[in-house]
């Protein structure tokens, strides 16, 4: 897949795309397809780990900053669909033990679902609360909601219902992956929803420290040369999100 993306980049290099809107529009459709395919491959890889139950290698980190950074990076992309993204936290900073790559992946999955099912003019809210030695991270939306009889099966692998997945891509792996991440942290995932009234997904994590502090090394996120935020939201974004100015 990386080789195909490289070949397309050679046929439509960035400097030409910046000066040719028609070429950029056509190349954006190709990039959108590449990102969706890579996201699917990554989800299939993560799904292969669903049977593992060993605890994740957590570190003491600032969870508020981690969530805030993801939301800040996503706001411009949400604006392309005219959906408001808001982040709220009960504390400006809060250190606890968690595996940062996994929590970022979980949040990406929840944001992607919320954006996918929220129409223009709607809103998505990410909220952090700290209650009775538990951390509550919730993502709520004003989207179409979910039928009550579907909620017990949301975290089942490969669930694919027409009412829940109107777009012709995805295998229903995102929520099972989220639940698995929660369980490997010693936490839980719950879903609340009503048709026409939106949905809320809440991650609950033990609010504790492990005694091993985060080491702020330079972070290297490979992702095959792809923009990690575009990759995470690829299923929910319109083609213009993959124009050259967003890829840079």
Regions found by a protein language model. Give the residues of each.
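Short alpha-helical segment of the dimerization/phosphotransfer core of two-component systems
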Residues: 32-37
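Glycine-rich G1-box
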Residues: 76, 144-145
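Short helix-loop "hinge" at the ATP-lid/N-box region of the Bergerat-fold HATPase_c
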Residues: 114-115
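Conserved glycine-rich
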Residues: 186-187
